[in-house]
Amino acid sequence: RVNARYQTVSLVIFFLLLRLPVLMGGAPLLIPELSWMLVGEQMDRGFMLYRDIWDNVSPLSGLTYWLIDYFFERSQLAYQVAACIVSLIQILYFNYVINTREVFPQRNYVPGALYAIFLSISFDLSTLSPMLMANTFLLFAFGKIVKILVRKEDPTQVFELGLYIGIASLFYLPASVFMVWGCCALLFYTGA
């Protein structure tokens, strides 16, 4: 149990070392990031999304950008720190799910480290994008599918699976495609 704590701390340190160049080097502000900041800024000024602001950002993403602008104004550092927090939650949860399913003979942090590397490769997953926020809830849905595959008769888990995919769709609309993934997983692996 003590070893698991050290592995978790080392996983967090590993991820922060991966993100340190971005946080310290002052990454340039890219057009999608600026667009998200402007959506939050306009919503903070009282404009309504889809009525006054014509953008393709999903409703919960717009709400998140509005809250960040409300508390921190147009700060790229706030967006990067929020992205790091969301990414850390994802990494730790993914590692937890993999370790509780005993995919490896011993508990280790290799799945979380690989997930951290993959998060750092893509721009959409290294900033506070709608895709990153939706991915959090898709990971929660993945955890529910794993539980459903173990305990085949639990209707509350099926509801939570759909709820998480629905919330992910409210952050990033193309995430609704994963509803098909959830249905197929339930159909093929549980016989439901």
What residue spans do the PLM features occupy?
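Membrane-interface transmembrane helices that cradle and orient dolichyl/undecaprenyl
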Residues: 139-157
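Short hydrophobic/aromatic helix or loop-helix immediately within or flanking a transmembrane segment
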Residues: 35-41, 52-77
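Aromatic- and kink-enriched transmembrane "portal" helix at the membrane-lumen/periplasm boundary
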Residues: 76, 112-132, 144, 170
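Perimembrane helix-loop-helix junctions
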Residues: 178-192
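Transmembrane-helix signature of polytopic, membrane-embedded enzymes
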Residues: 94, 98-118, 135-136
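Membrane-interface alpha helices of multi-pass inner-membrane proteins
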Residues: 156-173, 179-181
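Transmembrane signal-anchor helices characteristic of membrane glycosylation enzymes that use polyprenol
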Residues: 2-33
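Transmembrane-helix motifs of polytopic, lipid-linked glycan transferases
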Residues: 81-101
